[in-house]
């Protein structure tokens, strides 16, 4: 009996040990495989493999795990070169990432492991800007990017990094003023900024509980705040500090807080009553000007204060029921495109201009979104005609973007950053600066073959390509600029004073976007898969009509899990070779879910059952009672229940797990049109416009 009991215990222990030795998460293995290859497969990383393997069980060099998850990468001093790989965001359990004291070059990756607490890329040869993506990594406690070749201004991106205790940007080539969001670093203890080119004052630091501050050898000026003079370790030499007595701060002025009336927000640095009076007078004048502007225009250019329902704009929308026949448009995205060749014999779709030509082009062709030409453009039906793509000079784009300054940064993704380009005559464009490492350095064509294909894509719900720039190793695409921003901003980044999108507008956005995707899938030959459909790539024009962006760049999206982010990627798309147009349909269904619920596709801060929007919402899509509970609270119930139910039915079809059960986009468009037609007969005479004097919510 005793022997049997002993054997039972031994077997149980063996089973327990086997369960504990769980294989490393597949996505994390893939991320490390790609990283190993990108680092040029260094022999010093013992155990690492280019394909497969088990980092946790096989104890790969520098890899530490907890259970089946990789939690630390300690790779300091391995003389590593190359790049870091493009799947780092798959390492969701990683808390420590140390690549210090290596020979790494190029830009810091845009997409880093999202839950890092300690990031150390110091003592390398990294250049470019500090990535804005750091602003979303709320768990960061330590950032060390010292002793590299980083340049440009620091983005104002530190608002959410309240846990950050150590920040080291020393020995780089960073410039400009300190960002005002430094004031939000309430846990900061150590700040090293020495040996850079920072300017302005350091007043933004005065309310922080820092005990180790080094700002030596910069171009700071003004005075060292008294609050900082008692710091145990304070180094301030090599700057242009004022030798005069520092003036006392004016009553009520708090340094280190962003002022609503000042971009710098650093407070008043002069101590005279004249300056104080002047500042007060300036604020008063600004208030008067703002009141005058508000009185003159009921509708602001801001996306958050547009009066959709009482707008008096002339109707500018194509009839929602006017589906039309899809004309075939030949677009070369085939093998020739992949090889850097164009299917056309010439470059008749590309028009080169210099500075003078650019001025004429911006003045005559890129009209503002309130003029007659743009109104006519909105009413234009599908066309297979092409429009010349203008070749911009690098110097012109550098001037219009202030040398691609962080202040003009609109956003960034897995293949590059988008900047606002402002011209002296008031016109504005959007410039997508694509990562140069994505192009084969051995080929001279650069971005030209892509431009040849993109210039053929024309649809009223697709953001138009204006031109491009391929010069000195830079590859950029120039698009229309939309002041209203993206659907993502409207749904997820609005404040409590914002006017939410009405139900009618949400339906219109869904239908317009569906038509854009249908055009890519079924009017273009061969079919164009988007591979990056998400709310941040759906821009909204002056009248809140959708314009799909980032199309025709699928060659750069080797793994859609990298660029789409969590929540949008279709289940089958984990295997890049399995991506089909039906995978685009799934992503579009997720966007419709965002319109319905107002939630983001994945929210790691919610309880586990609610983190994935699709998994949480899908079981409730066919329950009419549950639908009212998951509908966006910002709608305040102002929607017809039948319309909500039909909208949910379409979503349920789009997000089917098996791609063969999802409808093609043409059927999605037809379903949305039928939904509009069946919901209210009153829409027959009003389908040409989505604006009415009184919105009856009858979709």
Swiss-Prot record:
Residue ranges of the region described as Disordered: 239-263
Domain Protein kinase: 404-675
Residues with Phosphoserine modification: 368
Knockout or disruption consequences: No visible phenotype.
Topological domains, Extracellular: 23-273
Protein origin, superkingdom: Eukaryota
PANTHER family listed in its UniProt record: LEUCINE-RICH REPEAT RECEPTOR-LIKE PROTEIN KINASE PXC1, PROTEIN STRUBBELIG-RECEPTOR FAMILY 4
Protein's name in the database: Protein STRUBBELIG-RECEPTOR FAMILY 5
Organism encoding this protein: Arabidopsis thaliana
Source species taxonomy: Eukaryota, Viridiplantae, Streptophyta, Embryophyta, Tracheophyta
């Amino acid at each position: 009996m005793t022997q049997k009991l002993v054997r039972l215990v031994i077997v149980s222990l063996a089973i327990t040990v086997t369960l504990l030795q769980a294989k490393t998460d597949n996505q994390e293995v893939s991320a490390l495989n790609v990283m190993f290859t990108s680092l040029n497969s260094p022999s010093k990383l013992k155990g690492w493999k280019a394909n497969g393997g088990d980092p946790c069980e096989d104890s790969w060099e520098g890899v530490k795990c907890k259970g089946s998850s990789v939690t630390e990468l300690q790779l300091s001093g391995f003389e590593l070169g190359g790049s870091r790989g493009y799947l780092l965001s798959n390492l969701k359990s990683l808390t420590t990432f140390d690549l210090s004291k290596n020979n790494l070059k190029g830009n810091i990756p845009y997409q880093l492991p999202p839950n890092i607490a300690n990031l150390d890329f110091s003592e390398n040869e990294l250049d470019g800007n500090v990535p804005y993506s750091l602003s979303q990594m709320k768990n960061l406690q330590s950032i060390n990017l010292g002793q590299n070749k980083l340049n440009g201004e620091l983005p104002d991106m530190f608002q959410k990094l309240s846990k950050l205790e150590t920040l080291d940007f020393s020995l780089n080539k960073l410039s400009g003023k300190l960002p005002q969001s430094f004031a939000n670093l309430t846990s900061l203890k150590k700040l090293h900024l020495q040996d850079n080119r920072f300017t302005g004052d350091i007043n933004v630091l005065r309310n922080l509980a820092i005990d180790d501050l080094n700002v030596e050898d910069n171009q700071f000026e003004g005075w060292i705040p008294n609050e900082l003079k008692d710091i145990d370790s304070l180094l301030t030499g090599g700057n242009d500090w004022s030798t005069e007595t520092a003036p006392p701060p004016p009553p009520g002025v708090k340094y280190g807080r962003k002022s609503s009336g000042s971009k710098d927000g650093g407070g008043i640095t002069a101590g005279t009553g004249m300056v104080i009076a002047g500042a007060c007078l300036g604020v008063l004048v600004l208030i008067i000007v703002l009141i005058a502007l508000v009185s003159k225009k009921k509708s602001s250019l801001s996306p958050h204060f547009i009066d959709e329902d009482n707008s008096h704009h002339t109707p500018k929308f194509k009839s929602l029921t006017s589906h039309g026949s899809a004309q075939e448009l030949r677009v070369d995205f085939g093998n020739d495109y992949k090889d850097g060749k164009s299917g056309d014999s010439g470059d008749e779709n590309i028009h080169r201009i210099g500075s003078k030509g650019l001025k004429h082009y911006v003045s005559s062709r890129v009209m503002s979104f309130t003029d007659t030409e743009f109104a006519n453009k909105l009413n234009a039906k599908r066309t297979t005609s092409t429009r010349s793509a203008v070749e911009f000079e690098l110097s012109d784009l550098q001037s219009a973007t202030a040398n691609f300054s962080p202040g003009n940064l609109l956003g960034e993704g897995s293949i590059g950053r988008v900047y606002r380009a402002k011209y002296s005559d008031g016109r504005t464009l959007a410039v997508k600066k694509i990562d140069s490492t994505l192009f084969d350095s051995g080929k001279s064509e650069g971005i030209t073959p892509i431009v040849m294909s993109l210039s053929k894509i024309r649809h009223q719900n697709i953001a138009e390509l204006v031109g491009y720039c391929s010069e000195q190793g830079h590859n950029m695409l120039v698009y229309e600029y939309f002041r209203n921003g993206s659907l993502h901003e409207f749904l997820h980044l609005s404040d409590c004073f914002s006017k939410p999108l009405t139900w009618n507008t949400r339906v219109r956005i869904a239908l317009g976007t569906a038509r854009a995707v249908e055009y890519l899938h079924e009017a273009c030959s061969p079919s164009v898969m988007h591979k990056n459909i998400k709310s941040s790539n759906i821009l909204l024009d002056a009248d809140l009509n959708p314009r799909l962006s980032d199309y025709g760049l699928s060659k750069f999206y080797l793994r859609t899990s990298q660029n789409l982010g969590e929540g949008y990627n279709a289940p089958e798309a984990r295997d890049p070779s399995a991506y089909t147009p039906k995978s685009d349909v799934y992503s579009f269904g997720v966007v419709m879910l965002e319109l319905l619920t107002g939630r983001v596709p994945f929210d790691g801060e919610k309880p586990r059952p609610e983190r994935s929007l699709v998994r949480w919402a899908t079981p409730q899509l066919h329950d009419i009672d549950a639908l009212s509970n998951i509908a966006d609270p910002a709608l305040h119930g102002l929607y017809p229940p039948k319309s909500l139910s039909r909208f949910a039915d379409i979503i349920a079809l789009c997000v089917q797990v098996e791609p063969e059960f999802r409808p093609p986009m043409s059927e999605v468009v037809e379903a949305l049109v039928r939904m509009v037609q069946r919901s209210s007969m009153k829409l027959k005479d009003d389908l040409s416009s989505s604006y009415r004097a009184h919105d009856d919510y009858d979709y």
